[in-house]
Amino acid sequence: LFSFVNDKRLLIYGLILGVFISSFITGINIMNYYLNSFELLISKSSVESLFITQRLYLGFFIVISTILLLNIYQSSVNKTQKYLSLLLIIYFLFMLFLISSRSALLIAVVVFLTTIIYGLKPLHSFLLVVGVGLIFSTIIITNKNLSSRFLYSEDSIRPSFIDKIKTHEPRYDIWKFSGQIFKEEKPYFFGIGTFKTQELLVSKYHLIPIEKRKNWFIERNFNTHNQYIDIALSYGIIGLLIFLIFVKEIVKFSFKNIHSLNLNISLLLFLIVENIFHRQLGSFIFALTLVLALFLIKSKNEKNINC
């Protein structure tokens, strides 16, 4: 569908505008909530209703928009467009920290490191990677909101970080049960299908000993929350290998343009924490990201030819 749009810049500008509006309204809601309640906002699940777009997806959209803005800033000869792009980049980075989307922040760090490695010599890249890692770690440890989101610092009962993950991160149980299903069903060739995969997951949720947690998992009807695991279970190892070959070709082709590469890396990392093909929105995200990544490569090639 997106490939039929002749001027892909309209897709880029439309996406950036939509993400800006959603994040701006969400930011206002967050600020109002914080000013009225004086509570630690980002760590509370009750604030999800303040997000116009679900936090996980909003964070990903912000990362994608930032990458596209970096491409505009680098390629544009219009000073006004450059300044506007830079201002929006700063705004989106601020919003990333405000909404405290863990996956988006980690993807953003990986994108930044990829850009460093792509453009610098190995020694300089190594030093900058170490520096960025130390700075990011310091921010996580010292910022109360981020420390709560990443390190579960508000939990003073459980002694170890692993125990905190087991308690507070639903993906721990989801991925554990998915692994059990893989061992039991042995979907080595053609898989067991999406319906049976979900059915078996729900049956596993009934085994959770804590009643409140068990009911929450069953009520939410969690899928695998990992696209790669879902493909392996639903379509077998053969299906996963075919998908990974497709992924390999995408990454290989996008090496021609750092921003295209970063778009694809962001998408592939996002698939680790979200099963996007179970949502219509997710399928649109997958298609749109690939179309825009391809467009960035083509536009760069056309620019080189014109030069």
Residue ranges and their predicted role:
Residues 7-40, 51-120, 141, 249, ...:
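Alpha-helical transmembrane segments of multi-pass inner-membrane proteins
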Residues 3-9, 13, 72-83, 123-126, ...:
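Transmembrane signal-anchor hairpin modules in multi-pass inner-membrane enzymes, especially those
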